[in-house]
Amino acid sequence: MELLKKIFLVLTLFISFETMSAQSIYDFSVLDAKEQTVSLSDYKGKVMLIVNTATRCGFTPQYKELEDLYEKYVDKGFEILDFPCNQFGQQAPGSVEEIKEFCSINFKVRFKLFEKVEVNGDNESPLFTFLKSKQGFQGFDPNHELGTLLDNMMKKADPDYASKSSIKWNFTKFLVDREGNVVKRFEPTDGANKIEEALKTLL
């Protein structure tokens, strides 16, 4: 048991050190759906939208909106990086292969899928630690049908939740410009039109 504690401590310190030492998003490497290491420096000069996704969520239909954006702007240097996450209501079950098949069949998704990650907590991806440090929580849209529901749910769990940068739910998105700056964060209640408006200023 003592050995496990030491291993956990070392891993935690390593993740913290990696995040602290990172000067740019291009300093990070991640695993893709085939468990191959991908350096985000491969995306230099591209505009990126990084999103944590789930296949059994009320926001899952956003896959279609994301694919529409991807098809519209990929030729202008736009990329979407899809990171499945099972932390919110266990709404991303199954293997990455199963997730990829689901997205392909139901939404004709062509943008790149990566390995499952955690976005909050002790085992969170260093990439998402970095993203959250650059763009905090933006607030749920009260005009969205799920906005008030999510707000009330979060307040019950933590009355001070809105002041924290943690990812609140599936389909939180981070927009990164061609120089690697994390310029915008979109909550799951933000519409595709809002994302597109910001995206067009960067292309």
Residue ranges and their predicted role:
Residues 7-18:
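Bacterial N-terminal signal peptides
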Residues 20-41, 61:
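N-terminal "domain-start" segment that seeds a small globular fold
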Residues 25-26, 48, 170-172:
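Short loop/turn microsegments at loop-to-beta-strand junctions
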Residues 46-47, 55-56, 60-84, 103-107:
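Conserved helix-turn-beta segment immediately C-terminal to the redox Cys motif
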Residues 77-94, 110-121:
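Thiol-based oxidoreductase modules, predominantly thioredoxin-like and allied folds used
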Residues 108-188:
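Thiol/selenol-based redox catalytic cores and closely related redox-interacting motifs
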Residues 183-203:
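Non-catalytic, surface beta->alpha helical segment in thiol-disulfide oxidoreductase systems
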